[in-house]
Curated annotation (Swiss-Prot):
Cofactor: Mg(2+)
Assigned EC number: 3.1.3.71
Domain of life of the source: Bacteria
Catalytic activity line of the entry: (2R)-O-phospho-3-sulfolactate + H2O = (2R)-3-sulfolactate + phosphate
Similarity annotation: Belongs to the ComB family.
Name this protein carries in UniProt: Probable 2-phosphosulfolactate phosphatase
Pfam families, per the entry: 2-ph_phosp
Length: 242
């Protein structure tokens, strides 16, 4: 195995796709995806733009779909829900498909949609991702942060570090030959420094501060929890995870 960490979709190579690509958007898209699928959603279908989401979702009956739209941390007008994972309970989502577009996370998934295996990871389902990687041992792994509109994010980097460190430590693979770029060491170092203070780190992060201004305090607490959901959102067809 060789692991690469990229802080934003824009940083990834354009010529080759890895054996396994992992999208991370801790605040909040991949946390929401993991939560919704764990709660019984039929699938999550991602879109880069709102117009396409509305057009495609119109083909589904209203009682079988949930339109999820977020821009700048706020719910998009015309959508049923914004991007708060706390809204996606089993009562809300069971048997329904989420049609989802967000500022950063869905763009991240679009960038890697042609990889052999595409996963969605957050802190809440870190363990499920690590166990999949240990079992399947993909030759090349990209862990791709969503960032914020093309910029670095603390929360996605600490999650990438949590995945990379657990995987390499538990497979006795913590050597240079398994590390594809410097960003892997940087991400692992961030995680090891903050692993017992993840909620505090979220509050320091620029997007965490943005969500505080929107009074999304409970979202920040929830997204900071690690290994609480045994769920592995995986792309089954282009743009559709379940």
């Amino acid at each position: 195995m060789k692991i690469f960490v990229y802080h934003t979709p824009e940083e990834t190579p354009t010529e080759n796709m890895p054996d396994c690509a992992i999208a991370v958007d801790v605040l909040r898209a991949t946390t929401t995806m993991a939560t919704a699928i764990y709660a019984g959603a039929e699938a999550v279908q991602v879109f880069s733009d709102i117009e396409e989401l509305m057009t495609v979702s119109e083909k589904w009956s209203a009682d079988k779909r949930i339109r999820v739209g977020e821009r700048g941390g706020k719910k998009v007008e015309g959508c049923d829900e914004g991007n708060s994972p706390l809204n996606f309970t089993s009562e809300t989502v069971k048997g329904k498909r989420l049609f989802m577009t967000t500022t950063n996370g869905t763009r991240c998934l679009k960038r890697i949609q042609n990889a052999k295996v595409v996963l969605a990871a957050a802190l809440v389902n870190r363990r499920s991702v690590v166990e999949y990687l240990k079992e399947n041992q993909p030759e090349t792994i990209w862990i791709l942060g969503s960032g914020w509109e093309g910029s670095y994010s603390l929360e996605d980097t600490v999650c990438a570090g949590a995945i990379a460190h657990s995987l390499l430590a538990e497979t006795n693979s913590l050597s240079d030959e398994n590390v594809g770029n410097d960003e892997v060491f940087g991400a692992m170092s961030l995680y090891l420094q903050w692993q017992d203070k993840l909620h505090e780190l979220m509050n320091h992060a620029s997007h965490g501060q943005r969500l505080q201004r929107l009074e999304c305090y409970e979202d920040l607490k929830y997204c900071s929890q690690i290994d609480i959901l045994d769920v592995l959102p995986m792309q089954k067809e282009i743009g559709v995870l379940s």
